[in-house]
């Protein structure tokens, strides 16, 4: 996991539940919400 994704993880968890699990990194990269 890149440092950029690691930095954005807390923001994503606050914005929406971690329903995608480890795939959250891919969501950050694509800018899409799989929820």
From Swiss-Prot:
Residues 1-10, 19-35 form a propeptide. Expressed in basidiocarps. There is a cross-link at residues 11-18 (Cyclopeptide (Phe-Pro)). Processed by the macrocyclase-peptidase enzyme POPB to yield a toxic cyclic octapeptide. POPB first removes 10 residues from the N-terminus. Conformational trapping of the remaining peptide forces the enzyme to release this intermediate rather than proceed to macrocyclization. The enzyme rebinds the remaining peptide in a different conformation and catalyzes macrocyclization of the N-terminal 8 residues. InterPro entries: Amanitin/phalloidin. GO terms for molecular function: toxin activity. Belongs to the MSDIN fungal toxin family. Probable toxin that belongs to the MSDIN-like toxin family responsible for a large number of food poisoning cases and deaths. This is MSDIN-like toxin proprotein 8. It comes from Amanita exitialis (Guangzhou destroying angel).
